[in-house]
């Protein structure tokens, strides 16, 4: 194989490529690099040059040298005695010289020997050739050196240019960094100044608040002092009234001896009893009165009488209270008690009796109330309520809720008047709160709902406005959830609600229409008005909101905008150019045509509506979508319609309540608050609310719990009443229609909108023969309890965009529970429809196969009566059915037992042949009868 390149030829010759290149250059073959290709002519030229330079050109070689090399190994022990292997190389060299066989005669040699002049001429020519070769080599070396020097200079220039460019780049980078540093320092200074200003404002505000708080505390203290002074004055007046002497008319009696009076008086003073004084002592006191000089006697008598009157009041029957109502039997009646304060303690007891006088209260009892709240309403301690309930045989704690009946019984037992509290009206309560706040009404962004038929380009239109790719991410390319977004435009913020267009999502579209200010009705210019377009128009007109029509796909060649306008006019949606009030805009979601004009029309409608809402108020709004997330709990997408929703607010949404733990915007980012017309996701509700429920922010969590409990109870009672009515209706319907097959289903979906849409679509599949029964439908993943319910009800579990957990899958596999997963509502409806079709009883259809005429009748002892027949049309087969006609009247219908021809059993006999036919369990046949043969075929039915 010949070598193709210089490098390969050099390897073959065992030379370096550089040496071979030099030799080729000397031979006049111009090759620059080792990868250049050599041909046979180049090799021949090199060979001729080498032979000429070594003097062997044109002559035979006289001497040849051969070198032989062989290698062998020997083993020899070293000084340590270890054997080592030594390689021995033997080289042999032999030289062979070729000798001439014929030696010419000396005369011939002499004649053939060249002359000295010829030799000199040859030598000079050789010398000239050698000089020319040397000069040529020197010129080539000079040219090569010159090229190398130029290449080296070029590389040096490029290196210098790169170094200069790098230095300039570094200088520019340093200048930019210094500018950025200066800008950052400037921004930091501005920020520090703003922070200092904010701190100063905060300090000033705090000082003002502290001053206001101090003034309020001072006013409160003054008010408290005034109330305390009034209470003390009232108590002093009561005490003075109680201590005032009575006017008593006493008749004169004969005087008694003074010692007796003295003894009576001293005895009275010593005893200090609470009982009335004896008659004798009283007489003595009255007798001693005249002996006293002037008014002194009257004063003593009045004091004694008032003292006895005061003691008498302590013996009156009193109502038991928690105060000391023993009439003076207290610590002062114990031995060793303080003696000097006895009179003061009695005054304190009288004051306490007046202060703790029992008052009958009117206690309003709500649906549920805790023990502590009930005690607070009756102004007593909770332990008294617990004691009363224990007497009634009910063990409770202080925080345990009581029902309304039990609480009213306790109130009556405690001596108060119990009244049923009015039912909580959350809307009125919220309206009362908002009106009490007197919040300022500010302009808000419009809420725009995009509605229309499926695949008319609603989501694609929003994608172009939002510059996102939502439509491609939806399963099946259709929207199955309500999407809420807010978009910032040069003229303000617009909030969009994207509703599904599929017929199953009617409830979602209705919710979107109720929560909106403006409706964008999307209608494809190449498709026209469709059923869901008409439904969207009805929802918008029912909600009373203006309609802006967007004619999508207007850039397609088959678009016919005028035809679509005429169809919409037929649905009472009249464009402005026809004298109506609905602007029509032709748009394209691909090219962006008409998008700006559409937004302009929407904002113009918003300006006409003058949308306003309070900002500094408790938030109110509507729940758009709900779901149950495994890691976050119940999640609700809400649209704030008024007020500001903040993290930490107590939210009441339908039958659920809770404190907002976190808020996320439509991009999944955390946010602290959301104003009017802003959609957010909130977490923290105790359960998953119903989509479409109104939500509101309450100040009191207890109030929110009461309202949610009341709503749940009301909903439960309504649901039970509906179920009972449905059971009665079903019972009467089943009695009238007979046995009806049911297909029990359990539906679990990711969001509530999809769950209710799927349930409604599946219930529509029910027929008179088979009925779809929704055993349970909910939001969240498929749990073990769902599988257990499916086992008990023999239901099929349908998961829409959800999956079963490990325990649920294990339980389902062990009990053969069918769990099916879907992410497109079409597929779920189609498969359930197919399953219902399989449950339908097949349709039996009769198909005629032939006729025969009985020409003779045979009677055999072992077989029975046999009809000798002639097949007039079609054929007769074994085990087919027949119909016996006599005088064109059907006599009997049965089965053919066997068919014989020429004493042989055959499967079938065709037209034009005779055969014997044995009829099963029937022998009453005559000549001339007609037989019709037919088969019953079962055909599968579909819904």
Swiss-Prot record:
Residues 120-163, 171-229, 313-323 have a biased composition (Basic and acidic residues). Residues 452-459 are annotated as: G1. Residues 443-612 form the tr-type G domain. The keyword Metal-binding does not apply. Residues 498-501 are annotated as: G3. This is Translation initiation factor IF-2. It is found in: Cytoplasm. One of the essential components for the initiation of protein synthesis. Protects formylmethionyl-tRNA from spontaneous hydrolysis and promotes its binding to the 30S ribosomal subunits. Also involved in the hydrolysis of GTP during the formation of the 70S ribosomal complex. The keyword GTP-binding applies. Gene3D superfamilies: P-loop containing nucleotide triphosphate hydrolases (3.40.50.300), Putative DNA-binding domain, N-terminal subdomain of bacterial translation initiation factor IF2 (3.30.56.50), Translation factors (2.40.30.10), Translation initiation factor IF- 2, domain 3 (3.40.50.10050). GO terms for molecular function: GTP binding; GTPase activity; translation initiation factor activity. Residues 588-590 are annotated as: G5. NCBIfam families: IF-2 (TIGR00487), small_GTP (TIGR00231). Keywords: Cytoplasm, GTP-binding, Initiation factor, Nucleotide-binding, Protein biosynthesis. Residues 96-229, 243-352 are annotated as: Disordered. Residues 552-555 are annotated as: G4. GO terms for cellular component: cytosol. PANTHER family: TR-TYPE G DOMAIN-CONTAINING PROTEIN, TRANSLATION INITIATION FACTOR IF-2-RELATED. It holds the Pfam family IF2_assoc. HAMAP family: IF_2_B (MF_00100_B).
